[in-house]
Structures are given as C-alpha cells and as structure tokens.
Curated annotation (Swiss-Prot):
Its EC number is 1.2.1.38. InterPro entries: AGPR_AS, AGPR_type-1, NAD(P)-bd_dom_sf, NAGSA_dehydrogenase, Semialdehyde_DH_NAD-bd. This is N-acetyl-gamma-glutamyl-phosphate reductase. The gene is argC. It holds the Pfam family Semialdhyde_dh. Catalyzes the NADPH-dependent reduction of N-acetyl-5-glutamyl phosphate to yield N-acetyl-L-glutamate 5-semialdehyde. One of its GO terms (biological process) is L-arginine biosynthetic process. One of its GO terms (molecular function) is N-acetyl-gamma-glutamyl-phosphate reductase activity.
Amino acid sequence: MIKVGIVGGSGYGAIELIRLLQTHPHVTIAHIYSHSKVDEPLKLTFPHLQHIMQHFEALTVDNNDCDVIFFATPAPVSKTCIPPLVEKGIHVIDLSGAFRIKNREIYEAYYKETAAAQDDLNHAIYSISEWQSLDNNGTKLISNPGCFPTATLLALHPLISEKIVDLSSIIIDAKTGVSGAGRSLSQRVHFSEMNENLSAYAIGNHKHKPEIEQYLSIIAGQDVSVIFTPHLVPMARGILSTIYVKLSSEYTTESLHKLMTSYYANQPFVRIRDIGTFPTTKEVLGSNYCDIGIYVDETTQTAILVSVIDNLVKGASGQAIQNLNILYDFEVTTGLKQSPVYP
C-alpha cells in the first residue's frame, strides 16, 4: 500500500482527497496535516467524517514515512514546505498555483508574491492528466492544474493541436461556485452578498489567465493570449466554461463533434455530449468527469464549447488522484469511479 499524507487538511481540497482516497485500493491515508489544528480530531472540524478517527498532525520532514504527499495549501505554504520533501525523495502533488507558472516575472505580476526558485519551477511537472505521462523514478513534484484551466484546456486542446483555430480570437466566459474561494471568510461570499447575485471578478488579472495562456502556447508552438472573464455564482461547487473561438478551417457542428469524440475516445473522464445537448454543472457534481458540449455557428465559423467540471474534484482533488494513478501506473480510474451525485 502507498502511504499518503495530506497537507492543508482543514480545507475543501483536503476534504475531497480524504473522501476519494478512502475507496482507493492501493492507498492508505497515513497522515493528515494542519498547522492550525495539531492534535485535534478530524471529526471535530468535519462532523460528516465521524467514522474517521485520525487526528491532525504537524508536518515534519525528518522521519516522514509517506510515499506521496498531497498539498492542498495556499501557494506560499507550498513554496516553503515542498522543496525539502522533494529533496528527501518523497513524491509531492501540489494543488496550489505555486509551481504552475514557469516564468517568475509573470507569476509575481499575477500572484503579487515572490515566485518559487527557478530550479523548483523547472522540476515541477504541470500535469493535465489526459495527456501527461509521469515517470515514477524521475517525477518527484507534480503541479496539479487549476480548476478554470482544467475545464478550459480540456475543451480547447484538440482544436489547438489540430491547428484549426484563429489563436487571436479565444474568449473564455467562466462561472464558478463559491467553494473555489476556499474556506476563508470574505465579504463577497457571505450569504447576504452572494445569494441571488451574479458577479464578474478579477477581470484581466485572474491568476488562472497566465496558466491557460502558458499551456495553450506550448500546444500551439507560439505565444497565445486569451480573454478570460470569471464569474461567481451562488452555488456551492461547479465550473461552467463557455469558450468562443474562430475556426480557421471550415467546420460544421457534426465535423467538429467527430474530431472531439475521436480525440477523447480513450479518455474515460472526458465525456463529449451528443450533438444538440449541453452539460450542466449538476451533471458532473461529485465526480471526476469533464463534460463538453459542442456547437459551430457556421455563419461566423465560430466554435462554441461548453465545458463543465466539479471544481473540487476534476478541478482539484480528483485530478490529483488521477495523476497519482498515472505516476504509479495504476488504472487511471482507480478510486475515481464515482458517478455524479444527482439531483
């Protein structure tokens, strides 16, 4: 059995890691770390986990017996705590943005904090699970993608790689539930502020914008910029990303649907919807699925892609476990076969 540790154990990302890893046949949760809740029973923070008798612990590097440690922490914590563990030879899967952006200047411009050391950035593997191979011996630090980038990149990757789009025309209109903001209190997620309300935020300066652009640029082999506008909606969890992109070749809905279906034929967690149907966030709730609906406006030759995920599963903890499976050469669906919770 692989001994796993979870850092940031009192946050939403950690809750999902605990829930999902309980059913993983090759994993045991050896340690749950939280610097603010050391020695407290897990069930005191999460009453729905009454059946788990573990206590929060303080993270240590010396004598740490984990094979893999998941970090579900803010980026500054990851930047400080992860390098010594990697140096010790422990596999680390980081759910923060600390190691996603390879250009330190761009990171500092968007995150408003000092970037990780360049050596650490160079060694971190940014892993969208659907097309990343990981070497158990060579890969020590996996940078798990963000939630908005996951939903967006899964939809755009086939079109960019097939070179059928006008790269200057990409518009991403994305909606997210409030769990994406974490458990920390802020005025904009108070019930009276959020309920029956819809708001755009971080226009032009969201941390996920350079992450999306960085990866699209790698696929395209040239610099790619996007217009990305996120919105906060009054629901607990879920992301719906509507993407508009001009096609440089003539396509119909049918021909683009065929391309997308073929591209993801062997990827169990990407479900391309039938023509004329478009996914909703509830239809992937609690699951590791990404559902994508496709339409081509033939008059303007514009592709409209609707991509939905659960931000806490496919957008965070589920993809992290998927990366664990790839790292250890397990079946990719191991521990992740849960159907969506509906209604």
